[in-house]
A protein has these predicted regions:
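Alpha-helical transmembrane segments
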Residues: 526-529, 546-554
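Conserved beta3 strand of the Hanks-type protein kinase catalytic N-lobe
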Residues: 172-173, 316
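Hydrophobic residue at the +6 position relative to the catalytic HRD Asp in the kinase catalytic loop
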Residues: 319-323
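Hydrophobic core segments of alpha-helical transmembrane domains in multi-pass membrane proteins
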Residues: 538-548
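Helix-rich C-lobe and terminal helical cap/extension of kinase-like folds
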Residues: 11-25, 46-60, 83, 264, ...
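ATP-dependent phospho-/nucleotidyl transfer catalytic cores
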Residues: 116, 123-130, 142-147, 190-195, ...
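Glycine-rich ATP phosphate-binding loop
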Residues: 171, 178-186
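N-terminal accessory/targeting segments that precede structured cores
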Residues: 1-168, 194-216, 550-551
Length: 554
């Protein structure tokens, strides 16, 4: 059966995507520099205009700046330059194309680094962009999968489900009758993004020389890592399979099945979720019990992703959450994910647990332990400021306005004042928590997400630290412990030889540093022997801790 053809080249409400040959590296460099210089002078003009409005424009420096702007005025975009600087910034990112739109969307989350006026404006970046014509969309499928569309699909809906900066999606029906979503990269996007990333990394290194406090090179490298994965749709397929495996024991939380036989670098075919988004009016008509069940599933799934798995949806918004008729919840659009290593995930778990249990001092301590600090950082002042912020939240009598996600974001945003930074994954995690909290209030206004989170966090704590799991984790260390037992006599012998050698030397204190070495070796050997004989873990854990302390002291 032939695939249904498009009847409307206007894309039914979408502007038509004008396909152009991607500019080369030199071309993109010229375009990028043009907008960068334009933004620089636009910022200077906005600064002068602001000072003039405040009657502060009569200083010598301001007069010189105004005089210099006269010479470049004929070359400026008059309509754009008269806008406030945050608006200029957003519009120039949109002009530069998909890479910079994605960059702006990431920067909109960095309230810890950028002024609020800029982050608020960047939240207005376009998310409904021109769509590739339907005939061209089918050609891209055939090129990507190297076979005619009619051999794979009975029908493809001409109207796009969505058209973003990098890709476009349509609903379709496979020849095997399953309803699916086809996601296709827009033509030229990968080449443009790859060239832009080369230039962005160069710009990041240059900005690092002048704005080292804001770590532009690190921020841009983080962004480049995320974006390169988004222009290879195989990564999104892997993400969907990882999420499904992590939640295989939770049938009420669903992730779309990927049809790998119809997927490649540029094409992704996945299960279509027929359901409602949280904004739908039908959701408001559900009973209180049904709403609480949905919130329980959504909040529980999000907390589980972050604090148990360390692998979470990093582009969550209400449109990416699906509510099914049988009151299950589904997550879609899985191209952007965040990952925590074991140590960070554990600290995040302790931090969040302290928050929901109302322990500001511990929460501030664990939040500080995850920060990126330098010799210029004022860690103690930051910790005190965070603790005071938590105390104010806890004293608040109006818990209807209590936003746990906003509290975390405000805490992280304080870091910039004290020369402290946080990894991008933590900012993405905060955005995910804010989104799921907002969805909770959308479905059931007035819900206290802190209370809803408490049971899930306590469950994860119990799972992570029950005796059986600790014994299994300890068993993984058996080879290292056996090796330690074998090497301990030699280490002890070497320590004694060192002691004998130092005793023969004429020193004011020949035993300095050696006593602790012997004690460290003794504790290590004793702990290893206790492990070998199956003694309870508190006994050998304490000995290993003492060995570590003595070793550091020596």
């Amino acid at each position: 059966m032939p695939v249904q053809q498009a009847q409307n080249t206007q894309q039914n409400g979408f502007a038509v995507y004008v396909e152009q040959r991607p500019a080369g590296l030199v071309g993109r460099f010229v375009i990028t520099i043009h907008h960068l210089v334009g933004l620089l002078f636009g910022g200077a003009f906005a600064f002068v205009h602001q000072k003039k409005a405040l009657r502060e424009a009569n200083t010598l420096e301001m007069l010189l700046l105004r005089f210099s702007l006269i010479f470049i005025w004929p070359f400026m975009n008059k309509q754009l330059i008269r806008q406030p600087f945050p608006v200029q910034f957003r519009q120039r990112l949109e002009m530069l194309g998909p890479t910079y739109i994605k960059l702006g969307q990431i920067l909109s989350l960095r309230e810890d680094l950028l002024p609020k006026a800029i982050t608020d404006e960047l939240k207005n970046l376009l998310d409904r962009l021109p769509a590739v014509p339907f005939e061209r969309f089918q050609e891209l499928i055939e090129t990507g999968l190297n076979r005619p569309v009619e051999t794979m699909f009975l029908w493809i809906e001409p109207t796009p489900l969505g058209s973003a900066s990098l890709a476009q999606t349509h609903r379709a029906i496979l020849t095997t009758r399953q309803v699916v979503v086809i996601k296709v990269l827009k033509p030229g996007v990968r080449q443009t993004v790859t060239r832009d990333i080369v230039l962005l990394r160069l710009v990041g290194q240059i900005l690092q020389l002048f704005l080292a406090r804001y770590q532009p090179a690190r921020l841009i490298n983080e962004f480049c890592r995320y974006t390169l994965r988004e222009v290879d749709l195989r990564f999104e397929a892997e993400n969907a399979e990882t999420f499904a495996a992590n939640f295989k024991d939770e049938p009420d939380v669903r992730f779309p099945r990927v049809y790998k036989e119809f997927s490649d670098h540029d094409v992704l075919c996945m299960e279509y979720f027929r359901g409602l988004t949280p904004q739908a009016n039908v959701v408001n008509k559900l009973s209180r019990q049904q709403k609480e069940r949905l919130i329980e599933l959504g909040v529980g799934a999000t907390i589980r992703m972050i604090f148990r798995d360390g692998f979470f949806h990093a582009d969550l918004h209400p449109g990416n959450l699906i509510i099914f008729k049988n009151r299950q919840v589904g997550f879609i659009d899985l191209g952007m994910v965040g990952r925590f290593d074991t140590q960070t995930r554990r600290r995040m778990l302790y931090y969040f647990y302290s928050l929901v249990m109302g322990n500001p001092a511990n929460a501030a301590r664990y939040l500080t332990s995850m920060a990126l600090v330098s010799h210029k950082s004022d860690v103690n002042s930051f910790r005190r400021a965070v603790e005071e912020l938590y105390q104010r939240w806890l004293r608040s009598s109006n818990f209807d306005d209590f936003s746990l996600g906003r509290l975390i974001l405000e805490s992280v945003a304080l870091a910039g004042r004290y020369r402290i930074e946080y990894p991008g994954e933590i900012i993405l995690m905060v955005k995910t928590l804010i989104t799921i909290e907002g969805v909770g209030h959308m479905v059931a206004p007035g819900i206290d997400v802190r209370v809803a989170s408490r049971g899930h966090i306590q469950r994860i704590i119990l799972e992570q630290y029950n005796l059986g799991k600790m014994l299994r984790d300890s068993a993984l260390l058996v080879p290292e412990l056996l090796d330690l037992i074998n090497r301990s006599p030699l280490a002890l012998n070497e320590s004694l030889q060192t002691l004998e050698s130092q005793l023969k030397q004429s020193r004011p204190d020949p035993l300095q540093g050696v006593r602790t070495s012997i004690l460290a070796g003794f504790c290590m050997v004793a702990g290893a022997i206790l492990v070998a004989f199956g003694s309870p873990w508190p006994f050998w854990a304490g000995l290993f801790l003492l060995a570590f302390v003595f070793a550091i002291k020596s």
